[in-house]
């Protein structure tokens, strides 16, 4: 039985929607258990309320929990071409796991959202992957066997580095069906590889 964690930070809900799709894909793989958790929020309740961020009652993860999983799929919105500070802060607390080699050989994968088509999707994904590589994780992306990656019928997120969505400059655009298809594919693909490595 492979244990997958979908771990995310989402301010306006785009990444939460993508996380649900990723988890849905992972759950399609028999013999896989999937948990969805979020990293702790760093902004005050007042600041979140003023920004119009919706409440999120998803369980909050602790860094030491990561060692309990065979595969971890991380999701974060883009902040100036990098992961959000909340995810960075969480990963910066995993030094103890790194020192003990607790994540070596575990599967790692990433997904993101950006405000625009060229708003830093790939730099965000690769910056997240860099941290996972320092932990010795086995990085899994989205291969081109996912036909939705080559969809030219719409402006869409999705890269070989990981699923992505375009939120628009005001955050009003929600993940498209094509983007959710890529997210589900990624979740399924990660679970299949995790099963092979954990078995």
UniProtKB/Swiss-Prot annotation:
Positions contributing to FMN binding: 10-15, 78-80, 113-119, 134
Domain Flavodoxin-like, chain residue ranges per copy: 4-190
PROSITE patterns noted in UniProt: FLAVODOXIN_LIKE
The organism's place on the tree of life at top rank: Bacteria
SUPFAM superfamilies per the UniProt record, alphabetical: Flavoproteins
Entry GO MF terms: flavin adenine dinucleotide binding; FMN binding; NAD binding; NADH:ubiquinone reductase (non-electrogenic) activity; NADP binding; NADPH dehydrogenase (quinone) activity
Annotated catalysed reactions: a quinone + NADH + H(+) = a quinol + NAD(+); a quinone + NADPH + H(+) = a quinol + NADP(+)
Entry's cofactor comment: Binds 1 FMN per monomer.
Cofactor needs: FMN
InterPro entries according to UniProt: Flavodoxin/NO_synth, Flavoprotein-like_sf, Flavoprotein_WrbA-like, FMN_Rdtase-like_dom, NQO
Binding-site residues, NAD(+): 12
GO cellular component: membrane
Keyword set includes Nucleotide-binding: yes
Protein keywords: Flavoprotein, FMN, NAD, NADP, Nucleotide-binding, Oxidoreductase
Ranges annotated as spanning the membrane: none
EC number(s) stated in the UniProt entry for this protein: 1.6.5.2
Binding of substrate, residues: 98
Top enzyme class: oxidoreductase
Family: Belongs to the WrbA family.
Name the UniProt record assigns to this protein: NAD(P)H dehydrogenase (quinone)
Biological source species: Alkalilimnicola ehrlichii (strain ATCC BAA-1101 / DSM 17681 / MLHE-1)
């Amino acid at each position: 039985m492979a244990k997958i964690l979908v771990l995310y930070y989402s301010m306006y809900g785009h990444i939460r929607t993508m996380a649900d799709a990723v988890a849905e894909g992972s759950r399609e793989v028999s013999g896989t258990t999937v948990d969805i958790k979020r990293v702790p929020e760093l902004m005050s309740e007042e600041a979140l309320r003023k920004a119009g961020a919706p409440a999120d009652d998803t369980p909050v993860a602790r860094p030491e929990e990561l060692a309990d999983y065979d595969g971890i799929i991380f999701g974060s919105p883009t902040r100036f071409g990098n992961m959000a500070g909340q995810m960075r802060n969480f990963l910066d607390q995993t030094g103890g796991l790194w020192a003990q080699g607790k994540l070596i050989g575990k599967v790692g994968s990433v997904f993101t959202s950006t405000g625009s088509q060229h708003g830093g999707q790939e730099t965000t994904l690769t910056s997240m992957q860099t941290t996972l590589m320092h932990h010795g994780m086995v990085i899994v992306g989205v291969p081109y066997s996912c036909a939705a990656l080559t969809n030219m019928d719409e402006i869409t997120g999705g890269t070989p580095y990981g699923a992505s969505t375009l939120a628009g400059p005001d955050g009003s655009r929600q993940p498209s069906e094509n983007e959710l298809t890529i997210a589900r594919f990624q979740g399924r693909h990660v679970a299949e590889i995790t099963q092979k490595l954990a078995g």
